[in-house]
Amino acid sequence: MNTTPDMPTPRALRELTPLEARILGVLVEKQHTVPDTYPLSLNALTAGCNQKTARSPVMNVSEDEVTTALDSLKHLSLVMEGSSSRVPRFEHNMNRVLGIPSQAIALLTILLLRGPQTAAELRLNSARLHGFADISSVEAFLDELAARAQPLVIRLPRAPGARENRWMHLMCGEVNVADFAGPDTGGGTDSVPPSEFEALKAEQKRLADEVARLNALVQRMATELGIDVDAPGDVS
């Protein structure tokens, strides 16, 4: 689904470091979400790399580390430094170097910033970068990225109980897909996503605490009224 047939011929690239990949993701993201401050200063770029939300994994890098990574990205022509400002500012050049359209850049950016995602998650999380009409259009661009001579993404095996496959970027090199498959539990039912499972555990604890509080209140009131009340779990 290449909607821009005149895209430049893609170049072969070396594997990026996690920080280099994070920098590219931040530059594309901020280009769309805060265009008034783009290209980014070193300070803004570092803050974006260390951002706590919409990042996986969360990083804590210094400006010196970002500067070193920027130098490497400039040698690869993936990043350009502007000269029209007193403060150095940086912008990405991914479209031209990778030879892919903006729709694919949007999907790749989310994978760079957030880690493995399903097509549905990518459509949702990339909305501020590009509005995809449906999940099938997301998958079409992902399939193109995966079918390149130098693949940029890979479809991970569906984890046991999961309804959808996740996708992962390959900008930092090949991955062992078995690491992302998860253990085979042998069950035939759908599993609960980790976030929902944690929420259920928290709700269970809250309800248990509430029951304990109400039991204590009943016992206290019964004592004050001189009423004999069986303790919870007693069988008369």
UniProtKB/Swiss-Prot annotation:
Belongs to the UPF0502 family. InterPro entries: DUF480 (IPR007432), WH-like_DNA-bd_sf (IPR036388), WH_DNA-bd_sf (IPR036390). This is UPF0502 protein BamMC406_5439. Coiled coil: none annotated. It comes from Burkholderia ambifaria (strain MC40-6). Signal peptide: none annotated. It holds the Pfam family DUF480.
